[in-house]
Structure formats: C-alpha cells, structure tokens
Amino acid sequence: MTICVRVRVSGRVQGVGYRYYTTTHAKALGVKGWIRNLPGGGVEAVLEGERKSVGELLGLMKSGPSGAMVSGMEIAEVECKGHDDFKIIY
C-alpha cells in the first residue's frame, strides 16, 4: 500500500549532509518525493512509497548522518501526488 507523509525535522540537520543522506537512502528504498532546507534551520520532506519503505526511511531520518542531531520530527499523512523520483529542492 502506497502512503505519503510530510516530515518536518528539527535539530542540527543543515550543513551536515542530511538532505544528501536522505536522498541516497530514499532512492535505495524506492521512496519518491523531495527534501528541502527550511528557514530557521530545519528540513522538510515529502515521502511517497510503500508503508514499509517509508517507515524504514523515517527511522534512518531520525538517526541522520554523522554530525546531525535530530531533536524532533513532525509527521503528517498527506495526499499522494505521484512523484516519479526523489530530489533535493534548492
């Protein structure tokens, strides 16, 4: 079953390779969507894929790459848009 979630991640997640880390894992898991930095230091992402794959990616995002320190994650289900890839929005 395909699900879609919007995730807002807070903590030390900018300047540590967090978007690249998430993109690499998303593509490996077959998750589609996007990720971007937010003003103020957080990161926002939309994840679309099989429930198991999205759940696994959320776990990886909670850990983050070395140098990151995730202090919070807000997760909400959203309408699926049929993304065809996972990309970083600049």
Swiss-Prot record:
EC number of the protein: 3.6.1.7
Residue positions of the active site: R19, N37
Any coiled-coil regions, as ranges: none
Keyword Zinc tagged: no
Keyword Hydrolase (UniProt): yes
Alphabetical keyword list: Hydrolase
PROSITE patterns noted in UniProt: ACYLPHOSPHATASE_3
Annotated GO MF terms: acylphosphatase activity
InterPro entries named among the record's database cross-references: Acylphosphatase, Acylphosphatase-like_dom, Acylphosphatase-like_dom_sf
Signal sequence extent: none
Pfam families per record: Acylphosphatase
Top EC category: hydrolase
Catalytic activity as recorded in UniProt: an acyl phosphate + H2O = a carboxylate + phosphate + H(+)
Acylphosphatase-like domain segment(s): 4-90
Family assignment from sequence similarity: Belongs to the acylphosphatase family.
PANTHER family associated with the record: ACYLPHOSPHATASE (PTHR47268:SF4)
Protein's recorded name: Acylphosphatase
